[in-house]
């Protein structure tokens, strides 16, 4: 049948967000062997760093010489596994579990990180949640508030908390999404938060440019992370990513280099921008 979607993954579903990487089939690809020490001696705070894109970024940053603070909700097994990969690179890794939608917790994250490490140089605001609903009428007030707290309020909280520790040359990187540009009829609230993240990135970059702090975003397309089986029905997971020009989902390891570019001195003339890693979809944004 002409309109039948290409199967890209085994059907599967998880009943808890943001999902568990160790339960996924196949496991997401998050590691490559090459390293150049572009982040030697720096420290990065990465929310959602236990799995998915956050794990790939954590491991890549470690390969490049950065100490890593991984902030995650409650996926302890994934977090411990990621910590092992990070520390295998000869750097330090601090795990902090909690809800980034809570401002007090975000303040505590920065407090703990500043006690363990001599500097904080990079903030990766990556944690997110999404809940599929067939229409706006099905989005409860609780879901709406929760999605905004996790996806965008957390970025305000952590940025405010970490800003006194950042110095010239520091970098803030926010995870947006292709949904900020294309929309998604079953992820209305999630897409709205991602649109807010793009504007937050642009506005904050203008606010901090005179301090020498760069602010950018990465807008992934369909990437194989635990959030996918934790969000979508098994039949939808089976064809996940088949609707982009490359006809497959991306792997976290294919997104992580964008974060490294924005965190390193390779991008010293880049701020307020969004990098699109989406399998070929043209968004002109």
From Swiss-Prot:
Q: Where is this region: Disordered?
A: 1-25
EC category name? oxidoreductase
Cystine crosslinks:
none
Lineage runs: Bacteria, Bacillati, Bacillota, Bacilli, Bacillales
Q: In its UniProt entry, what is this protein called?
A: Uncharacterized oxidoreductase YhxC
Q: Provide the binding site for NADP(+).
A: 45-69
Report the SUPFAM superfamilies cross-referenced here. Answer: NAD(P)-binding Rossmann-fold domains
Any Pfam family = adh_short_C2
Species this protein is from: Bacillus subtilis (strain 168)
Q: Where does substrate bind?
A: 177
Q: Which UniProt keywords apply?
A: Oxidoreductase
Molecular functions (GO terms)? oxidoreductase activity, acting on CH-OH group of donors
Q: Which InterPro entries match?
A: NAD(P)-bd_dom_sf, Sc_DH/Rdtase_CS, SDR_fam
Residue positions of the active site: 190 (proton acceptor)
Q: Say which domain of life the source belongs to.
A: Bacteria
Entry's EC annotation: 1.-.-.-
The reply to whether Cell membrane figures as a keyword in the UniProt entry is: no
Gene that encodes the chain: yhxC
> Does this entry carry the keyword Ribosomal protein?
no
Question: Record's CDD domains?
Answer: SDR_c1
Q: What is the similarity comment for this entry?
A: Belongs to the short-chain dehydrogenases/reductases (SDR) family.
């Amino acid at each position: 049948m002409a309109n039948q979607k290409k199967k890209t993954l085994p059907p599967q579903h998880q009943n808890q967000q943001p999902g568990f990487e160790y339960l996924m089939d196949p496991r997401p690809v998050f590691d490559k062997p090459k390293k150049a020490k572009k982040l030697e001696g720096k420290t990065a705070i990465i929310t959602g760093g236990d799995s998915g894109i956050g794990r790939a970024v954590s491991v890549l940053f470690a390969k490049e010489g950065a100490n890593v603070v991984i902030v995650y909700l409650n996926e302890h097994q994934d977090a411990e596994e990621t910590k092992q990969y990070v520390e295998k690179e000869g750097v330090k890794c601090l795990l902090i579990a909690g809800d980034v939608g809570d401002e007090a917790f975000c303040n505590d994250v920065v407090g703990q990180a500043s006690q363990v490490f001599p500097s904080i140089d990079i903030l990766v605001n990556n944690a997110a949640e999404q809940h599929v609903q067939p229409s706006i009428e099905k989005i409860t007030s609780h879901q709406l508030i929760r999605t905004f707290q996790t996806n965008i309020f957390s970025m305000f909280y952590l940025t405010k908390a970490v800003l006194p520790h950042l110095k010239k040359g520091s970098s803030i990187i926010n995870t947006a999404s292709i949904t900020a540009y294309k929309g998604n009829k079953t992820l209305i609230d999630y897409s709205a938060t991602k649109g807010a993240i793009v504007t937050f990135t642009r506005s904050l970059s203008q606010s901090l440019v005179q301090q020498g702090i760069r602010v950018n975003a990465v807008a992934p397309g369909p990437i194989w992370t635990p959030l996918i089986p934790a969000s979508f029905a098994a039949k939808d997971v089976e064809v996940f990513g088949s609707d982009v020009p490359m006809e497959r989902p991306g792997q976290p390891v294919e997104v992580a280099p964008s974060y490294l570019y924005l965190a390193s001195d390779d991008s010293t003339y880049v701020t307020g921008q969004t990098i699109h890693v989406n399998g070929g979809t043209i968004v002109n944004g």
